[in-house]
Regions:
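A boundary/linker detector
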Residues: 1-49, 57-61
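Short metal-binding segments enriched for Cys and/or His
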Residues: 6, 11-23, 81-104, 135-138
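Helix N-cap and loop-to-helix transition residues
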Residues: 12, 72-73, 129
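Short metal-coordination and nucleic-acid-contact micro-motifs, chiefly zinc-binding Cys/His arrays
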Residues: 44-51, 121-125
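Short cysteine-rich clusters marking metal-coordination/redox-active sites
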Residues: 52-56, 129
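Cys/His-rich metal-chelating microdomains
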Residues: 58-61, 131-135
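Histidine-centered nuclease catalytic patch
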Residues: 58-124
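Domain-exit/linker segments immediately C-terminal to small folded modules
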Residues: 111, 124-127, 133-137
Length: 138
């Protein structure tokens, strides 16, 4: 597939159409990302003019700028929190019927809130354009 700047994005129909059963770890990751989504949106909105921290582009569409975790990465934050928490790590998750998202269940509200607090105290964000974010080593 090509985008408007003729950058070729690899695309594989067979891979996309294969249904892979999601694991508990997948659902936990999705729920943790969803729990902090409001904070990432607020960060992006507060930036004013969006400029990619890597390539310095500033003429992309708003939706083509991503909020990226760095130093520490999201993965590092997630893993450290899971090591430190004294709360039971959820093993089952809810589904947001409106947006079709994996979310924490109501009974895991304390775990979710602890995660949000930990994340917000320890995260660093940067703005990257879509292309730089997708090419960035995770």
């Amino acid at each position: 597939m090509k985008n408007s700047q003729t950058y070729i994005t690899p695309f594989n129909w067979v891979y996309c159409c294969q249904f892979k059963e999601r694991t508990t770890s997948d659902d936990l990751l999705r729920s943790m990302r969803e729990a902090i989504k409001c904070d990432t949106i607020k960060y992006k909105q507060k930036q004013g003019k969006l400029i990619c921290n890597f390539c310095k582009t500033e003429n992309e569409l708003y939706e083509n700028y991503h909020v990226d975790h760095y130093n520490p990465s999201f993965k590092t934050l997630k893993n450290k929190f899971l090591q430190l928490t004294k709360k039971q790590i959820p093993l089952s998750f809810g589904d947001c019927k409106i947006y079709k998202l994996t979310i924490f269940k109501d009974e895991d509200e304390d775990f979710k809130n602890d995660w949000i607090d930990y994340h917000n105290k320890n995260c660093n964000f940067q703005i990257l354009c879509r292309d730089c974010n997708l090419r960035k080593k995770k």
